From Swiss-Prot:
Pathway where it operates: Siderophore biosynthesis; aerobactin biosynthesis
Domain of life: Bacteria
InterPro entries recorded: Aerobactin_biosyn_IucA/IucC_N, IucA/IucC-like_C, LucA/IucC-like
Stretches of the chain forming a coiled coil according to its record: none
Protein name (database record): Aerobactin synthase
GO molecular function, one term: ATP binding
Underlying gene: iucC
Catalytic activity: N(2)-citryl-N(6)-acetyl-N(6)-hydroxy-L-lysine + N(6)-acetyl-N(6)-hydroxy-L-lysine + ATP = aerobactin + AMP + diphosphate + H(+)
Enzyme nomenclature, EC number: 6.3.2.39
Keywords: ATP-binding, Ligase, Nucleotide-binding, Transferase
GO biological process: aerobactin biosynthetic process; siderophore biosynthetic process
Function: Catalyzes the attachment of the second N-acetyl-N-hydroxylysine to the carboxylic group of N-citryl-N-acetyl-N-hydroxylysine to yield aerobactin. Involved in the biosynthesis of the siderophore aerobactin which is a chelator that mediates the high-affinity iron transport systems induced under iron-stressed conditions.
Length: 591
């Protein structure tokens, strides 16, 4: 706690300035309010007589990028106070129509995020952008800021300060597996425990002391009984499973086995862990009943069970499609997965969704297992990060590569955007390519290829039946969301352009390559791909990335309106506004 206090004492004011700037900028982008231009920059006038003034520049997305150090607050009645994120939220509460009970919950997320921000800034004191850029991927992401769009991106509601020190990515604390076995008998009706898996030559953990559990994989069939080894974070056992699965524990269906095996490090997503004992071993993705950003971080059973089949199919696509082979893109497969529902909650379909997502496990190939000689992996999110002095990591990669900015970015767009767009146009499949889902493989510090992952809920299919999907198993089609062409295109536009490139292009602009140049280059690479594959022209027209107006997707305001604790489903984003397409604006700027 002493270190936490030191971080708060040193960085509290700076963290609040940055948070206020992000709140004002993102909320205005989501159309919560509009700024008024002034001679010095911009101002926001609120109904309570309060005025926020600041300097900033409007980017190509129509969003004002605010200088946090320039923000001042002026009140009609009370004396001016230091810049405070909590105070800003109180000023905005009437405008956001947020009742006190909801406000209190989000205030908890705000305070936890500010604490996390202060600790990160303290941790980043001793590291430069150059040093951070060269760290291994698993260690590097423990320095990252988190979700770029959600203003309260380290809420982790449910964790206390001790939990943060043990489980938060920025704590960079490794831990052992925590395991249990779940036993169920087959019955004629669908069982509450299901598994999907295939045997592997290596067990995913070190042998346990008991010889019975030397091989810990799934499924292991014993007559009419199936025994599945589950992994989970110790917090999940202590705070959820040991209480909510008490019936299964009492009847010896669920048996706690304790901590053992390899050491794992939490990734930026909290619920995915990397094997640091054997980096080429499997990552594991686990349900975690902690509220962070938009939802509780459980995993729906239907997605867990469909994941291995979906990843098999996507992998076959990438191994057989000539363009994807040429791009050397690969899939991080999910060779096995398991899910167990608690018997009583399974009978309550309208219960809050977090009670249906308590116990499961997904084994996923690690990025390290796919790398060739001379390659290294980073998350796409790394390109959005800067050090404490504001030096972007992307600048370090470009400089180390010896390439021009334009050449480096051309390689980036060819390696990342083209495979995702090709997958959509040729197969009617979208994968949400946000900064955590895209693993970028570098060679000589330049973009070379991508590794794709996450097929539980972040994969969608076009509404109409495409013949290219004929070989996709019905079990996957049944649980996968389908969207018409004019909506599914926004998985690329919003999932990648808005959520990732929107935060990279301003950093590149600082390096002398303007945002119009950035998006014009992206458009040029897309047009080059389209010109080389005219056989897909009808699909290109259906999935048109160059329409003048595109959907504006809002997350923060939607979260404030959603009753997460009581809801049987996750929040849905706002999709009721349009914005000018940067790809089109960049072409107009050229003219």
């Amino acid at each position: 706690m002493v270190m936490d206090q030191l971080a708060l004492h040193r960085y509290w004011a700076v963290a609040n300035q940055k948070m206020v700037g992000k709140i004002l900028s993102e909320f205005a982008y989501e159309q919560a309010f509009q700024f008024e231009p002034t001679a010095q920059g911009y101002q926001l006038n609120l109904e309570n007589g309060t005025r926020y003034c600041f300097a900033g520049e409007e980017n190509i997305w129509g969003q004002v990028m605010i200088d946090p150090t320039s923000i001042t607050r002026h009140a009609e009645i009370e004396a001016d106070e230091p810049i405070s994120a909590a105070l800003l939220m109180r000023d905005l509460q009437p405008l956001l129509k947020m009742p006190d009970d909801a406000f209190a919950e989000h205030l908890e997320d705000l305070n936890a995020t500010l604490l996390g921000d202060c600790k990160l800034m303290q941790r980043n004191e001793a590291i430069t952008a150059r040093d951070l850029a060269m760290l291994p991927c698993e260690q590097q992401q423990t320095y990252f800021d988190g979700h770029p769009k959600f203003v309260f991106n380290k809420g982790r509601r449910g964790w206390g300060s001790d939990d943060l020190k043990r489980y938060a990515p920025e704590a960079e604390r490794v831990s052992n597996w925590v395991g249990s076995r779940f036993i169920t008998r087959f019955c004629s009706s669908p069982p509450t425990m299901k598994s999907h898996g295939k045997p592997c030559c290596k067990a995913p953990s070190r042998p346990m002391k008991s010889s019975r559990w030397t091989v810990c994989w799934l499924p292991i069939s014993l007559d009419s009984t199936i025994i599945v080894m589950f992994r989970f974070i110790l917090w999940q056992w202590s705070n959820k499973l040991a209480l909510l699965f008490v019936r299964e524990i009492a009847t010896k269906q669920l048996v706690y086995l304790g901590e053992f095996g390899d050491h794992f490090l939490p990734q930026l997503s909290l619920r995915t862990l990397s094997n640091v004992t054997r980096p080429a071993g499997y990552d594991i993705k686990l349900p975690l009943t902690v509220m962070n950003t938009s939802c509780y971080r459980g995993i729906p059973g239907r997605y867990i069970l469909a994941g291995p089949t979906a990843s098999d199919w996507i992998d076959q696509v990438f191994k057989s499609d000539p363009l994807l082979i040429a791009k050397q893109a690969e899939v991080l497969q999910e060779p096995a997965a398991a899910f167990a529902a608690q018997a009583d909650y399974a009978l309550l379909p309208n219960a809050p969704y977090r009670y249906h997502e308590l116990l499961g496990v997904i084994w996923r190939e690690s990025a390290a297992s796919k790398l060739k000689a001379g390659e290294r992996a980073i998350l796409m999110a790394a390109l959005m990060e800067s050090d404490n002095q504001g030096q972007p990591l992307i600048a370090e990669y470009v400089q180390a590569s010896g390439l021009t900015l334009e050449a480096w970015l051309s390689k980036l767009f060819d390696a990342v955007v083209i495979p995702y767009y090709h997958l959509l146009c040729n197969y009617g499949v979208s994968l949400i390519a946000h900064g955590q889902n895209v693993t970028l493989v570098l060679e000589n510090h330049a973009p070379k290829r991508i590794l794709l992952k996450d097929f539980q809920g972040d994969m969608r299919l076009v509404s109409r039946e495409y013949p290219e999907q004929a070989s996709l198993d019905d079990s996957v089609k049944k649980v996968t969301v389908r969207l018409p062409e004019h909506l599914i295109i926004h998985d690329l536009q919003t999932g990648h352009f808005v959520t990732t490139l929107r935060f990279i292009s301003p950093l590149v602009a600082k390096l002398g390559f303007s945002e119009p140049q950035f998006y014009r280059l992206l458009g040029d690479r897309l047009k080059a791909y389209m010109a080389a594959h005219r056989e897909y022209q009808p699909r290109f027209e259906q999935f048109d990335l160059f329409k003048p107006r595109i959907l504006r997707i809002g997350l923060n305001l939607a979260k404030f309106r959603h009753s997460t604790d009581a809801s049987a489903s996750r929040m849905l984003p706002d999709m009721d506004d349009m914005l000018n397409n940067p790809l089109t604006k960049a072409l107009e700027h050229q003219g």
